[in-house]
Amino acid sequence: KKFEYLKGGKLSYKELENLPVMCLEGSTSTRKYVEDYLAERGTFVRPEFELATSDMLIQFAVRNLGVASVVSDFAEKYIENGELFILKFDKAIPEREFCIVSNERAPMSAAAEKLYDFLLVP
């Protein structure tokens, strides 16, 4: 495993500038959130790959093509079986908060209900 040497230690965000970072495409709110957080701390990364989905980021990471930022739930099975691991930083990125707005007079689609249920799970 190419990045095994990073396992178990704590990194500074600045160290990301020297790693092959993989990100979601630039138009996503998640990408903007992470970039803004890093920029506030003086860290600017140039992604090796910009991919459309978290699933793609996970698959590239499994193949040791770089390090990626994804919601841990999406990578849970890969983390549990040891194919991936979570990088530890000297300061954690704060969790994001979401607000859900719905119309009580209009039923939610099946996809909206699934997202709603997912976001409500603690």
Question: Where would I find each of the regions flagged by the language model?
Answer:
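Active-site-adjacent beta-strand anchor residues
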Residues: 23-24, 50, 68, 101
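Short beta->alpha junction loops/turns
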Residues: 26-27, 50-54, 91, 105
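Short Pro/Gly-enriched coil loops immediately N-terminal to beta-strands
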Residues: 1, 9, 13-17, 89-97
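A late-sequence structural motif
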Residues: 87-122
